[in-house]
């Protein structure tokens, strides 16, 4: 279950990184999104009885780094265009390929809510994709999260 969760969630996190790049944010913002996203993967794995350290392996961190770091990633590319245009419709017109993170963001949020796990990065992407939040408002919301101890498994 951990590998499956990590695979679905990395696509959503790659969207968030792409959005931040498209909006002109730099590596610090990308690192924040990847780190918090990885923490969300680990917490969801733990809540579903999987080893949360799965998130630290190739199926988690490895896939996450590849998807978030590669300009060839469909999820990151979709996010970049969305971050530049601010329009989900325009982005869908420009990207005619399947983008897993767009389809799975809402479902991952539902899974997290069922088990009581907070997933602010994933939630923000789902809100952008469903049109209830602009990329600017979503990133602002994420930046306003108070800094606290981010234990990898909690």
Predicted regions mapped to residue ranges:
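Ligand/cofactor pocket segment of small-molecule handling proteins
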Residues: 27-31, 35, 41
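NAD(P)-dependent Rossmann-like dehydrogenase/reductase catalytic/cofactor-binding core
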Residues: 4, 17-21, 25, 46-56, ...
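Flavin (FAD/FMN) cofactor-binding and adjacent substrate-gating region
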Residues: 1
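Flavin-binding catalytic cores
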Residues: 37-49
């Amino acid at each position: 279950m951990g590998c499956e969760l990590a695979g679905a969630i990395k696509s959503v996190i790659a969207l968030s990184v792409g959005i931040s790049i498209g909006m002109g944010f730099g590596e610090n913002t990308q690192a924040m999104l990847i780190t918090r996203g990885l923490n969300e993967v680990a917490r969801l794995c733990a809540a579903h009885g999987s080893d949360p350290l799965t998130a630290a392996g190739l199926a988690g961190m490895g896939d996450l780094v590849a998807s978030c770091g590669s300009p060839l990633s469909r999820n990151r590319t979709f996010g970049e265009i969305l971050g530049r245009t601010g329009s989900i419709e325009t982005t869908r017109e420009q990207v005619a390929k399947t983008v897993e993170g767009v389809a799975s963001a809402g479902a991952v949020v539902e899974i997290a809510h069922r088990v009581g796990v907070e997933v602010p990065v994933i939630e923000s992407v789902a809100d952008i994709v469903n049109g209830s939040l602009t990329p600017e408002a979503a990133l602002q919301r994420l930046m306003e999260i108070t800094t606290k101890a981010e234990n990898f498994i909690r």
